[in-house]
A protein has these predicted regions:
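Sequence/structural signature of beta-propeller domains
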Residues: 1-175
């Protein structure tokens, strides 16, 4: 479950940075399933779902426990240098949608997904003890055309950034 650390009124769906200058916050890992593979035992932590159901229908299990809905996570990678986790969130054209698409709307824009009808995606950075119960996060990229106000490129000058859309896979080089 994730929360932003900026006042809700500063997140209006336009993608404009909040006053603190970053899309960031904290979160709490929610346990869905535990396993003891040596003894071939698995335990569900989701009421009304077996361990097998949690393993197969993970998104539904996460919804049942109130986990944060994300904008189509496509890849998760750990930096071999910093141990930070990076998540490519491809897009979600229905976030904050109105009219005919409102019924498909996952939820309104939030600090972890600050753009209405997010057509270009995001890249999130997660740090702290990944075996722990809590974490901190920030949006490294709010993708799109750098000429648009609703983009953010980790603090880099937008004039020096090419358009980025729908991040899919992440990789690290030796640098």
């Amino acid at each position: 479950k994730m929360e932003g650390n900026s006042p809700e009124k500063e997140i209006d769906g336009s993608g404009v940075l909040p006053e603190d200058g970053a899309f960031d916050g904290s979160g709490e890992w929610v346990k869905l399933l535990t396993s003891d593979t040596e003894n071939n035992k698995f335990e569900s932590h989701v009421d009304g779902m077996s361990a097998e159901e949690v393993a197969i229908f993970t998104r539904e299990a996460a919804d049942k426990v109130g986990a944060t809905k994300m904008d189509r996570p496509e890849d998760v990678e750990v930096s071999p240098v910093t141990d930070k986790v990076y998540v490519a969130l491809t897009n979600n054209k229905y976030r904050g949608a109105t009219g005919e698409n409102a019924k498909k709307n996952q939820e309104d824009p939030t600090e972890y997904a600050p753009v209405k009808e997010n057509k270009n995606g995001l890249v999130m950075e997660i740090e702290d003890d990944h075996a722990g119960e809590k974490f901190t996060w920030n949006l490294l990229l709010v993708c799109g055309d750098p000429k648009e106000a609703n983009t953010y490129f980790g603090g880099f000058d937008k004039e020096k950034v090419s358009p980025i859309s729908c991040p899919d896979n992440l990789a690290f080089d030796s640098h």
